Regions:
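Alpha/beta enzyme core
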Residues: 2-250, 284-293
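Flexible C-terminal active-site loop/helix
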Residues: 251-293
């Protein structure tokens, strides 16, 4: 990663920052070319694309930090990465924060669900005791390598215990040193406004999941409410899944890939993945390619 600005500097700017969800090398490179100022590694997308299973607590720390390393190494802007519950107790949280930072992330999200955790817009989520959740945030804050590495503190208590409980936890997370507050899945516009009004002046993140539990709003609308970050974690992988399904259906029926849904031209894909730099390297160091006559 060769970021020219830190997440903390981005948070100090005016306006609401749009964060697209990325989950692998291709999505990361694609989003990085589109002019976004920062990216977010979605746990759902990372687990789905690497393991082919649901985001239900099955991914390990090792699997996730490896994905952070891949994505951070492919982009030029800061990356916030989903750290789930920290993959265990307080010592695990410390290891996770340090590992994500060493892998190139500019920030990490830590949440208060019980293990095994689940995607924040699905059913049957439960949270750990409030004091234990606060302790995880304190450990995360102390474990980061510098203040430029931001801690996103997420609570899922709205679903299990109600909005008042979620706001109380978020307040304590802020007191523990969290840089960004993430109250997961408010279920009405009024609840979103209440979150924003309760923490006026704090850096607030709103999670916009297509088809999720929270009213789906634009970054401008969320910024007007008082949110600092508008996260769209599923847009990329939902679009990719729809495109692949259409392309594979056409291939199955027609017996050929072209002539159906739009495909990215091969040369554009090569450019996206860095082949021009590979060719320049080979020319610089005298690498020759042998072609059959």
């Amino acid at each position: 990663m060769a970021e020219s600005v830190t997440m903390r500097e981005l948070l100090a700017r005016d306006g609401c920052l749009t964060l697209p969800g990325v989950y692998d090398g291709i999505s990361a490179r694609m989003a990085d070319t589109m002019g976004f100022e920062a990216l977010y590694m979605t746990g759902y997308g990372a687990v789905a694309s690497s393991l082919g299973v649901a985001d239900a607590g099955v991914a390990s720390y090792t699997e996730m930090v490896d994905r952070v390393r891949v994505i951070a190494g492919a982009i030029r802007v800061p990356l916030i990465a989903d750290g789930d519950t920290g993959y265990g107790g307080l010592l695990n949280v410390e290891r996770t924060v340090r590992g994500y930072a060493a892998a190139g992330a500019a920030g990490i999200q830590i949440e208060d669900q019980e293990f095994p955790k689940k995607c924040g817009h699905t059913e049957f989520r439960r949270v750990i005791p409030e004091d234990d959740a606060v302790a995880k945030i304190r450990v995360a804050v102390d474990a980061r390598p510098s203040r430029d590495f931001v801690i996103v503190a997420r609570t899922d208590a709205r679903y299990s215990d109600g909005l008042d409980a979620a706001l109380r936890r978020a307040e304590r997370f802020l007191e523990a040193g969290a840089d960004i507050l993430f109250v997961e899945s408010p279920e009405t516009p009024e609840e979103l406004r209440r979150v924003a009004e309760t923490f006026r002046g704090a850096a607030l993140l709103a999670n916009m999941v297509e088809g999720g539990r929270t009213p789906y709003l634009s970054a401008d609308e969320l910024g007007t409410m008082g949110f600092k970050l508008a996260l769209y974690p599923g847009t990329g992988f939902l679009a990719a899944a729809a495109s692949m399904r259409a392309a594979y259906a056409h291939l199955r029926e027609a017996g050929i890939g072209t002539g159906g849904p739009a495909l990215l031209p091969f040369e554009e894909m090569n450019a996206l993945m860095g082949f021009p730099a590979v060719h320049a390297f080979e020319k610089k160091y005298g690498v020759t390619q042998v072609r059959a006559a």
